[in-house]
């Protein structure tokens, strides 16, 4: 339970920090000047707007925690095999540990970025009066005043932001096709039946007869699908196992085992995409730090920094550029070699 709460605490921070990095990337690289970006960042942290994100995401995380515990109790009532519990907890712990490592990395990058940004001199004359980002800040200032009035206003703000975030998440969820990829799995939650195909025998029945006589598939048990050794944290393949692919290929038992937990095969895909997004945004933070460090030393900013566009399909590297496969290190690839070796920035000191 303690480790679960630790995970959700880090997940709340990760989600809030990702929202902040999205603003950094769009402001710094695509549209505004460095001085404007620095001023906005300092204003954002000095006025504690990020606490609103923490409050909203804390409420959502507690809801997810209750949902997770409810489904876990369902497994306790249905299953009596201790191996099922062991393997389920190992899979969950594996994802929790990964998220904790990613959050710790992002936290270190964020602290270092703020220190560098605060050390760069900000010229307020460069900030335009008609800057749309400043209008957005004024809007948030009004929200903060309303939020600090009383307890009811706080609840109202949290509910509005939570509902808006929920709608935005659902729209993005459907837009990017995650529901399309897992439509068969979602449908199985209501039917709990699968089509059985026998490749060894010939079947001359028509398609209508086949549809009307579907039999449930004999789904392999969790002990048959996985080995205990595969879930050892000391196994190098443990950190690179594509669990969502395995679960989808095996046609996992959606009535019991892991599917009744919060971590369904569909959730594995969503969590994986969240991690990839965290990688992308952490790269943007690293690039923002590199630009700030370059300006601090009085050197011109190169075009490849301003046109920074990292890919999500990147591996891990040591701070000095050596390749690696262990988790918890700075993610990257070509972008890291460019920043670490060619530009000789101080990112490796994070």
Swiss-Prot record:
* Source organism superkingdom: Eukaryota
Keyword check for Plastid, yes or no: yes
Compositionally biased residues, Basic and acidic residues = 197-212
Query: Which cell locations does it reside in?
Result: Plastid, Chloroplast
Q: Which UniProt keywords apply?
A: Chloroplast, Plastid
Q: Where is this region: Disordered?
A: 197-217
Any one cellular component term from GO for this entry?
chloroplast
- Where would you say this protein principally sits, based on its record? plastid
**Protein name, as recorded:** Uncharacterized 40.9 kDa protein in 16S rRNA 3'region
Organism of this sequence: Euglena gracilis
């Amino acid at each position: 339970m303690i480790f679960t709460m630790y995970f959700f605490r880090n997940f709340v921070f990760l989600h809030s920090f990702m929202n902040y990095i999205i603003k950094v990337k769009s402001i710094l690289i695509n549209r505004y000047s460095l001085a404007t970006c620095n001023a906005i960042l300092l204003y954002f942290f000095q006025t504690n707007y990020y606490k609103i994100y923490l409050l909203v995401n804390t409420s959502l995380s507690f809801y997810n925690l209750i949902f997770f515990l409810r489904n876990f109790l369902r497994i306790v009532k249905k299953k009596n095999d201790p191996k099922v519990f062991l393997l389920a907890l190992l899979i969950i712990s594996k994802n929790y540990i990964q998220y904790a490592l990613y959050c710790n990395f992002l936290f270190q990058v964020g602290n270092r970025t703020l220190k560098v940004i605060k050390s760069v001199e900000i010229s307020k004359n460069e900030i335009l009066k008609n800057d749309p980002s400043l209008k957005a800040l004024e809007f948030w200032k009004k929200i903060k005043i309303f939020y600090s009035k009383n307890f009811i206003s706080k609840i109202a703000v949290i509910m509005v932001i939570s509902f808006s975030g929920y709608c935005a998440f659902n729209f993005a969820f459907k837009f990017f096709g995650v529901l399309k990829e897992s439509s068969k799995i979602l449908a199985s939650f209501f039917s709990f039946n699968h089509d059985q195909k026998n490749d060894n025998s010939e079947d001359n029945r028509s398609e209508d007869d086949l549809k009307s006589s579907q039999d449930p598939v004999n789904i392999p048990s969790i002990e048959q699908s996985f080995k205990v050794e595969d879930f050892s944290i000391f196994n190098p393949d443990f950190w690179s196992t594509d669990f969502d692919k395995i679960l989808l290929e095996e046609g996992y038992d959606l009535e019991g085992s892991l599917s009744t937990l919060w971590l369904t095969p569909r959730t594995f895909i969503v969590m994986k995409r969240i991690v990839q997004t965290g990688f992308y945004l952490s790269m943007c933070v690293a690039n923002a730090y590199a630009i700030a460090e370059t300006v601090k030393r009085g050197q011109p900013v190169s075009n490849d920094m301003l046109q920074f566009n990292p890919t999500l399909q990147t591996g891990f590297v040591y701070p000095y550029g050596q390749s690696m496969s262990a988790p918890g290190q700075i993610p990257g690839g070509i972008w890291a070699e460019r920043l670490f070796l060619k530009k000789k920035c101080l990112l490796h000191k994070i």
